[in-house]
Amino acid sequence: MNQATLQQSGKGYNVATVGNLSTFEGKAFLKEIIGTTSMEVSFGSLAPGQSVPFFHHHKQNEELYIVLSGEGIFTLDGNEINVQSGSIVRIAPSVSRCTQCTGSTPLVYICIQAKEDSLTQYTMTDGVIEE
């Protein structure tokens, strides 16, 4: 299993790495390493034929999965959804979910969790252009 490591930090920022994604295995949670305060971020990798060993849902957090490489199936409330490199999947807290790698190469993804309905400012309303 890969571990995230902090590379650099300064006032208001942290930089970390999980290493080479082509050799990444397992799961690495980043919240504690990078100090996020409004979300959990993790990298995950499933080997060919491997699946998460349980179905689960969340109490408050929605999840956003960004598939970086590989192919797989997300089973969402009993519906099988095929995913591949470039797929983006948003899952509400109450939806039962499980992920499986169906390709010949690992399924590598980023998962971002944040409290559902908590976003009040976003790029165009929160960003400030500096001169």
Give residue spans per PLM region.
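Short, charged/polar surface micro-motifs in flexible loops or helix N-caps
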Residues: 36-39, 47-51, 71, 115-118
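Double-stranded beta-helix
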Residues: 8, 98-131
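Conserved short histidine dyad/triad with adjacent acidic residue
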Residues: 23-29, 42-58
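Short, conserved beta-strand element in jelly-roll/cupin
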Residues: 45-47, 57-75, 114
